[in-house]
Amino acid sequence: MSPRTWQERLEDILMCARNVQDFTAGMDFVSFLDDPRTIRAVAFEFTTIGEAARAISDEVRERYPEVPWEKMLGIRNVLVHEYFRVVSLLNVVER
């Protein structure tokens, strides 16, 4: 299997972001917290976003400083290593 290009990784990020918007459309904070399926789906998408961002080279990241690379990596780390902080997901979704 050939490695994915940074452009393909960026497409993955954009697709996951659209999925998060679709999954949470019309939800408020309470609705989100009461829906474990949506919580898990959103967590998976954010984890995927973080993994895709991590695979993009520093050179590419430096070319696009306006992209919140560190935030993408950070949310992935929270989800993987501090999974008990899931409530912070909706704050990210709302932005």
Features from the language model and the residues they span:
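Solvent-exposed interaction patches of small proteins and small membrane subunits
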Residues: 1-95
